[in-house]
Amino acid sequence: MNIKFDMFVKDSNSIDSEELLNNYLTLNVVSQELLIQNAQKPLTPLSIEIGKTRTINKNIKSKLNFIMPSFCEYYELEGNYILYFKKLKIFEDFIIYKDQSIPISNQMEIKIGKGKVLVNGKKISIKDEEIKNNFIRDLNFLSSIKNFRNQYSHGNEIEAVESISKKENSINSLVIPTFIKFLGEIIIKTKDTIKFKNLMVLSDNFNILDDVIYQVENNELNLKNSKNSVVYKSIKKSIPIYLLSKVFEHTEFYILEKNNSILNFFCKKRIEDFNENSEDKEFNSTSENDSHESSIDLKCSSEVSQIKIERFHEYVSLFSKCISKNVDINHKNDKGDTALHNTIKNLKKESGPMVAALLSCGANANIRNNKHKVPLHFAIEFGDESIIKILLAFGAKPFLEDSISFSERDPGKIYKELNKSGQVLKILYEIGVITKLFDNFSVLQHVKTFILLEILFQNSMNILKSDIFSSILNNIFNQNIVRFKLIIQNLKEPPLSKFKKIEKFDRSELGKLIGKGANGKVYELHYNFGGVEKHCAVKEIKVDKYRVGAVLKEIESTALSQSPFTVGIYGYFEDEKNNFLYIFLEYCPNGNLFDIINKEKMKSFDEFFSYAFGVVHCTHDIHSNPKGALIHRDIKASNFLVDKNNLVKIGDFGTARFDCTLNLSSLKNGAGTVCFQAPEASRGKATIQSDIYSLGVVLFELCGAIPYKNYNYFFPFGDLKYLRVASAVSNYLRPILHPVIPQPLSDLIYSMLNHNEYDRPTSFEVFQKLKKVQEDYESNKEEWNSIFNTIDMKEDQQFHHERQEKVALMIKKKYLLTRPITESLVNHYDNIVFNIDYSISLNF
């Protein structure tokens, strides 16, 4: 029993484009305009019979019945069918006639009779004379280009297509085979294929057909009892879907696509790894603007020069054809991605030739998708310096302020990707600049340095025109001059690659004493580490032999988190005989921040922001450690050191813990300086947000250090040194800033001192807000800086006197408070424990 399909196509002017899109098998693949374009002229209703198939799925039948007439016609030929395409081209080597394949060869015997055609002795009955003539013409044409398939399968698609297009009688109708004897094998191997709705995916899965065809042609594959087998039935069910997939895969349908999704798929599919089996070649391509190509002049590092010139030119040619057919090469899909986004995202390091071709044909390198990512984001995320160079050469902007995080992805996976991304990242990892690309702040801060360092280390500045390179430097200077100085310094003095145990050391080698604290003494020393001389600060600690392991573990945790924002730890020496431990640290000659803000008088808020951004950078840096966020638990001004370049670094990780559930119990042990502890930390539950509270106290200190006119109180409650505590925790009191402090800054600090840890901003949010505060300052510098000269001494003293009275009143009522606000009040009382009545709620 034959199944008949009665189909027709309406006039293109009357096509219901909405209905076409709603019913189309691959919804987001073809635009309305394209469907209308392909349905050109009204067709007479035609009848199709598909062999003796009885098992065609009704759903498939309806879809086939609907979609195929939009760009091809059907004709019945004795239980078989022929598709006559209007514009599309497809090339196969078989005709199926009554379940038998008729191979098309260079020497094909075709006999024409009245209403009959004999092909290699097999009869085909054709009643319509016009159909018969078209059929014969196509057979002759196919036999004359038998070498097409070999040409096509060896990567010469363009030559193959051009060889056909040059023929006088170009094909407009071709016979489509069903491949009955071997298609079933493919269905079995890709048994889930028929479940897919996207023809592009189907097309990919059918690529294996080339190998199977070869086996059939060489009699290497035989299917016994095929008509009654599961394979045979699977074939029959799959034919309509298979035909559709082949139409998409091998035709010019790609470059007719208006909404760019097929172009994106082409970019994904037609690529060859430019590093694989290729010799180094320089490539140049210059063409007129009319052809939508811009000049390429990339004579640079080997990574770029490995791009195959042949493939590059082929892609340029293909994309030029796309543009000539009004395809928008910068069109966005529903995710906002362009062809350039998808090429880099899907192909990663294999995308070189395609990226260069897209850019040379006018692709915009600075278009953002719906997640605000530009192509440069993906190139950096996948760590491919070659693609970064290509993008930069075509005008990709290296500053990415509006970038978002990679937080939707597993940070561990991204970290592994970064570790596999080549020599540049290895260098950056040693320096510690680019180890955390997966979080917001790191993308903002490290993208620029990644590009700069990559260029500097590879000595490839010639890749960029001077104006582009100048733009990079200007943006880096304007946006983060502190970090840029730090990077340059690291380039001059590369740090030691690993924290290690020092085998030989004599205490007599120590230089002058430069510091002393409750935990030990600090000496200056110049020490040679395997040929690298370092100016060190050596911390001498008296350690009980039973605690050495625990102390070393803490030191190791610090070493693991080393970056340009942490005081470097070069190594340690254990004096087992005298129970001393010597920690070799980076020397910071400008001392700690506490001493600086006590001894020096700030003249403007420029100095405040310089230090404020420094402490925020440092805090965020340890919070975004790739091995797990590191909770410092003892953030205070004296633990921020300032190096010879006036860059702020964080040190003293003696109480630090990595933030993970396995270590939660270790965070319950009280540690840190009492006056800087957050409410929850004082209860033995330290979190990352506890560090934010302490950071807020440091910013508070920076504000308190502003020398108002005749102002002698460098810190809040500065004259009440007998108090061991000056602010409450939880829902008690919090520090009070002087009212002269500008509102944007005081709002930020108060948000960091929120009694509820979950309402405090993250370190990155602190950075963002501080940047906005700085912008407010930049636009009102005169007003902000005027507070240095406008505070009257009486008014200033009255403000502090009122605060003193309130504190004294609280003491009188026996409301025990938990912490003084400044280090100066508890320099010698770091280990004092206070009893706190948390049932009492106090407010000013």
Curated annotation (Swiss-Prot):
It comes from the Eukaryota. InterPro entries: Ankyrin_rpt (IPR002110), Ankyrin_rpt-contain_sf (IPR036770), Kinase-like_dom_sf (IPR011009), Prot_kinase_dom (IPR000719), Protein_kinase_ATP_BS (IPR017441), Ser/Thr_kinase_AS (IPR008271), Ser/Thr_Kinases-Pseudokinases (IPR051681). The active site is at residue 634. GO terms for cellular component: cytoplasm. The keyword Plastid does not apply. Residues 508-773 form the Protein kinase domain. SMART domains: ANK (SM00248), S_TKc (SM00220). The keyword DNA-binding does not apply. It catalyses: L-seryl-[protein] + ATP = O-phospho-L-seryl-[protein] + ADP + H(+); L-threonyl-[protein] + ATP = O-phospho-L-threonyl-[protein] + ADP + H(+). ATP binds at residues 514-522, 539. Its EC number is 2.7.11.1. ANK repeats lie at residues 335-367, 371-400. GO terms for biological process: signal transduction. Keywords: ANK repeat, ATP-binding, Kinase, Nucleotide-binding, Repeat, Serine/threonine-protein kinase, Transferase. Belongs to the protein kinase superfamily. Ser/Thr protein kinase family. This is Probable serine/threonine-protein kinase DDB_G0267566. It comes from Dictyostelium discoideum (Social amoeba). The lineage of its organism: Eukaryota, Amoebozoa, Evosea, Eumycetozoa, Dictyostelia.
